[in-house]
Amino acid sequence: MAKINFYAEGVSLPRIRRRIVGKWIAEVCSRYGKAVGEISYLFCDDEYILKANQEFLDHDYYTDIITFDSCEADTVNGDLLISLDTVRSNARALDLRYEDELHRVIIHGILHLCGLKDKSKKDEAQMRAAEEKALVMLRETIGSELSLLHT
């Protein structure tokens, strides 16, 4: 049974429209022949994600998302840590709405769980194209000016 959980550590939990997010994630997963199992999002600050990056991945830098893959066969399971600080600073640097960048990061982790990579230039280009397809799907569902966040 599909279950998507949202938690926060050191930040306020974004007011996620859970039903819409769940439907969107399920649609994206189904495009890759996958079903949603159990997914947990932990929204955090930069310091929390830096510590996790150091402890679990031996990386000494900030990042927007860390994805821990627990997938089984064709079922998507995983834990995703998202730094809202980095999402916000990336949105400013890219001149994007915060909500749009958060949507991209939310689905970026799901795409990793569906098997996409982003370590090489070719893989990164494929990831960006998949993100854009997923974001188009979202915009078609909720409208381009709307957000997955309650305002």
Swiss-Prot record:
GO terms for cellular component: cytoplasm. Disulfide bonds: none annotated. The keyword rRNA processing applies. Pfam families: YbeY (PF02130). One of its GO terms (molecular function) is metalloendopeptidase activity. One of its GO terms (biological process) is rRNA processing. Its EC number is 3.1.-.-. Its cofactor is Zn(2+). Binds 1 zinc ion. The keyword Metal-binding applies. Zn(2+) binds at H108, H112, D118. Signal peptide: none annotated. It is an enzyme of class 3 (hydrolase). InterPro entries: MetalPrtase_cat_dom_sf_prd, YbeY. NCBIfam families: rRNA maturation RNase YbeY. Belongs to the endoribonuclease YbeY family. Single strand-specific metallo-endoribonuclease involved in late-stage 70S ribosome quality control and in maturation of the 3' terminus of the 16S rRNA. This is Endoribonuclease YbeY. It comes from Porphyromonas gingivalis (strain ATCC BAA-308 / W83). The gene is ybeY.
